[in-house]
Swiss-Prot record:
Disulfide-bonded cysteines: none
Single GO term (MF): N-carbamoyl-D-amino acid hydrolase activity
EC assignment: 3.5.1.77
Record-annotated active site: E47, K127, C172
Positions in coiled-coil regions: none
Superkingdom of origin organism: Bacteria
Keyword hit for Ligase: no
Quaternary structure annotation from Swiss-Prot or TrEMBL: Homotetramer.
Function in brief: The enzyme catalyzes the hydrolysis of N-carbamoyl-D-amino acids to the corresponding which are useful intermediates in the preparation of beta-lactam antibiotics. Industrial production of beta-lactam antibiotics is now being developed using this enzyme.
Domain CN hydrolase, residue spans: 5-276
UniProt organism field: Rhizobium radiobacter (Agrobacterium tumefaciens)
Protein name as annotated: N-carbamoyl-D-amino acid hydrolase
Catalytic activity: an N-carbamoyl-D-amino acid + H2O + 2 H(+) = a D-alpha-amino acid + NH4(+) + CO2
Taxonomic classification: Bacteria, Pseudomonadati, Pseudomonadota, Alphaproteobacteria, Hyphomicrobiales
Alphabetical UniProt keywords: Hydrolase
Length: 304
């Protein structure tokens, strides 16, 4: 007997710096409601889905920087998203900037959560592979200061039971690293999902700009195929505060085939019928980890 569900990606168009959280949550609610009307069981939203991508600026005012972070989840503004999800019986994945205070010290993470169909948070992930730089670089048309505004995640790559599926998360740059996928594949993840804010221009290597979409989809397709898992990636896309962000949010099958792909640079919901048992098909007959892996030869991967 197959285990079927409808999976969705809720791509966001650009978020202006002046746009309020209330406005952004309203847009997310529209997509959540749209997805539920189409029979969706779970929807994936982007990285840092509640604000503009603030690491493109160099802030010297700590209070201004802190305004982009969430100190509780859900807070009063975001709570309607959870309540509506529970009313509609639909789960979701949401990315946001997390600020916690431990021992009087502020800690900042690029975070993602899994919420089940009852509106309960059942999983959390903090971005591990932080791209960009730590200090201001004058030559750039925009900054990419994730290494300044976040510390690397400290939760590993957990896999959670979310309603009927085993799910894991990545955030943006994580999708480019095979270790991200393999750890969750070894843990039995059936759906690996996450969000991204990917500029189409990379100032250090502009000769790669024409490959931005290719590398994004290559990472998603290879990760899904080599680990026998469904995957879903939700982008924040379009011209956001002078920076063009990549579209092509997608859903990928365990075979590596793209089964749904966005076609716009604005808020858009795409869906796919997902048979979770197809993961077993790949893991038994092609990537059978127990039968074929030789981990005694892989030590170098964890040493450097």
């Amino acid at each position: 007997m197959t285990r079927q569900m409808i999976l969705a990606v809720g791509q966001q168009g650009p978020i202006a710096r002046a746009e309020t959280r209330e406005q952004v949550v309203g847009r997310l609610l529209d997509m959540l409601t749209n997805a539920a009307s189409r029979g969706v069981n779970f929807i994936v939203f982007p990285e840092l889905a509640l604000t503009t991508f603030f690491p493109r600026w160099h802030f010297t005012d700590e209070a201004e920087l802190d305004s982009f972070y969430e100190t509780e989840m859900p807070g009063p503004v975001v709570r309607p998203l959870f309540e509506t999800a529970a009313e509609l019986g639909i789960g979701f994945n949401l990315g946001y900037a997390e600020l916690v205070v431990e021992g009087g010290v502020k800690r900042r993470f690029n975070t993602s959560i899994l919420v089940d169909k009852s509106g309960k948070i059942v999983g959390k992930y903090r971005k591990i592979h932080l791209p960009g730089h730590k200090e201001y670089e004058a030559y750039r048309p925009f900054q990419h200061l994730e290494k300044r505004y976040f510390e690397p995640g400290d939760l590993g790559f957990p896999v959670y039971d979310v309603d009927a599926a085993k799910m894991g998360m990545f955030i943006c740059n994580d999708r480019r690293w095979p270790e991200t996928w393999r750890v969750m594949g070894l843990k039995g993840a059936e759906i690996i999902c996450g969000g991204y804010n990917t500029p189409t221009h990379n100032p250090p290597v502009p000769q790669h700009d024409h490959l931005t979409s290719f590398h994004h989809l290559l990472s998603m397709q290879a990760g899904s195929y080599q680990n026998g898992a469904w995957s879903a990636a939700a982008g924040k896309v379009g011209m956001e505060e002078g920076c063009m962000l990549l579209g092509h949010s997608c859903i990928v099958a365990p075979t590596g085939e793209i089964v749904a792909l966005t076609t716009t640079l604005e808020d858009e919901v795409i869906t796919a019928a997902v048979d979770l048992d197809r993961c077993r098909e790949l893991r038994e007959h092609i990537f059978n980890f127990k039968a074929h892996r030789q981990p005694q030869h892989y030590g170098l991967i964890a040493e450097f």
